[in-house]
Amino acid sequence: MSASKNEKIIKASVIPLIFPILLWIIHLTAQFIGLDLYKMGLLPRNTTGLLGIVTAPLIHGDFSHLISNTFPLIILGWIILFFYPKVSYFLFIFIYLVTGLLVWIFARQVYHIGASGIVYGFVSFLFFSGLFRKDNTSITLALIITFLYGGIVWGMLPGMKGISWESHLLGAVTGLVAAYLFRKVDPPAKKYDWEDGPDDFNVDDLEVSYDPEKNKFDI
């Protein structure tokens, strides 16, 4: 394995940990000092709630809420950073902010908290990238994502108490838009037959198509 490939794997394994670690630091600190952060959540169509576009994904109701988002963020973050490195950082910012803005515009007027909108955005991006890009890698990733996270589609339906289904739905919509906008970024490298490896023959051993003995003509 080349040094660049090792570096890519290490980078993809470390960077996706940063955001979940930040979430845990915030939650543990709030628990330790008895601070209730829910009012820093996103309150739709309220000017004071605009701050929640940035702060809401950082806040979680309890440990189960936080844990349910932690592992998908790490796994999906690794996949995106490894297979779509050029778009990965901007994708995170795009899904983070656009999902929040859409929730602020369209969602119910209750406090919305948690990073699940980002999770849904990541899942949607990976799934629809397979449809838009149509290369083998993207299609394979889309199938894997469908197998691992296909059941989360139920989280986009209204009716479940204590669930911001709007964040889930609008995160998925944002991921779909991102998959289309970035469909030509990080294309798979084209490989030709002659790139498979060095020639396994010696040019001196090649047969010559011209044989002077067989090409004599009687005059």
Locations of regions flagged by a protein language model:
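A detector for small-residue-rich transmembrane helices and their helix-helix packing motifs
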Residues: 1-219
